Amino acid sequence: MEYDDKLVRFRQGHLNPFDKKGGAERHPADSETQPCKDSSTSSPLSVPEYNYPDRVMDLGVSEDHFSRPVGLFLASDVQQLRQAIEECKQEILELPENSDRQKDAVVRLIHLRLKLQELNDPLEDEPNLRVLLEHRFYKEKSKSVKHLCDKCSTFIWGLIQTWYTCTGCSYSCHSKCLNLITKPCVRSKVSHQAEYELSICPEAGLDSQDYRCAECRTPISLRAVPSEARQCDYTGQYYCISCHWNDLAVIPARAIHNWDFEPCKVSRYSMRYLALMLGRPVLKLREINPLLFNYVEELVEIRKLRQDILLMKPYFITCKEAMEDRLLLQLQDRQHFVENDDMYSLQDLLDISSGRLGCSLTEIHTTFAKHIKLDCERCQAKGFMCELCKEGDILFPFDSHTSVCQDCAAVFHRDCYYENSTSCPRCMRLNLRKQVQNPGAEP
């Protein structure tokens, strides 16, 4: 009997947390042992009442010892999720500031909102490629949120939203914004009209734009009513804040006319256009601003190196070893350097200004000259002897102390050539040979 009394007291003092009834269920043996108890004895050991309100917030996100994984919610209705969000927000306000329970509630609130966003904007099985206004949009797989939609200027939530990027101009937007795009791909303009605006900020005024954005035609004003007008330093036109994000870019006209490479604010469309045009050799400096060579010494050095490389090119084309070593591929990033010496890209001018191009081109020039003059016997055999003094080493047209006849391409010492500039031995010999072969021809 003493053991049974202890067992009853133990069961009354240790409650079952899973028992939701008003009192603890008693073993039949206990009823027989303790047929009745007065209120004074049972009061201290009575089982407390537990109320379990049916709250929407508890539908998969309430805190308990057997909580479900984060992100798993039983609430599948939009109305239930909204009610759960409100209850979670109220709980956050009631909990102690910076407590662990408040932080957990904030995490639950975030997941509830993501779930609601997913229901409002469900993922659709959309195609991987969309072609629109010469844009080639490919579906992105990145879940990063560090992107902004170029159309609506809002964040792209890659975790729950489908978004696309144009492979031609890097235009990024939500899938729901694709049909709202009105501007064609910038790459099409680069392909058909590869030229720069060479006037510095050619402003025409807001009245010429009818006080509307130059791209989307949204009403704008310099007083920011109804929308702020932002000027693009490249086109000189005004844009709204959705089409002009204050991006910075180097302006070609300022670089050519002022040798100024300070980035200026441009519109989104101009930024993409300038980025695609950056490496295109479309600037003929001798025609646009020939005086620039008188004031920028680096340009003169680069022009001389490029002229020398063009003189070296015939040696490499006819040299088997040079073709096997692919020496000319050292300039594959600047293909125009082996085609002409007067066309420049904006990237070339940037690298000249920073000094990077001068260093790299000097190294390439040294490598090319070493192959022709030292490493390759076939290329050495194509050198020249000065026919005026008949002294000295083998000469090459790219040597700094030589001069080349403009008619027959013979190479002489510079001093010898200018002292005998009235006559070229090789030209005289070729003319004499023509007279012998064609006696009736004029000299």
UniProtKB/Swiss-Prot annotation:
Zinc finger (Phorbol-ester/DAG-type): 134-185, 364-424
Region spans: Disordered: 14-49
Biased composition (Polar residues): 31-45
Pfam families tied to this protein: C1_1, RH_dom
One GO term (biological process): positive regulation of bone resorption
CDD domains in the record: C1_DEF8
Keyword set, alphabetical order: Metal-binding, Repeat, Zinc, Zinc-finger
The family this protein is said to belong to: Belongs to the DEF8 family.
Protein name as catalogued: Differentially expressed in FDCP 8 homolog B
Organism for this UniProt entry: Xenopus laevis (African clawed frog)
Gene field: def8-b
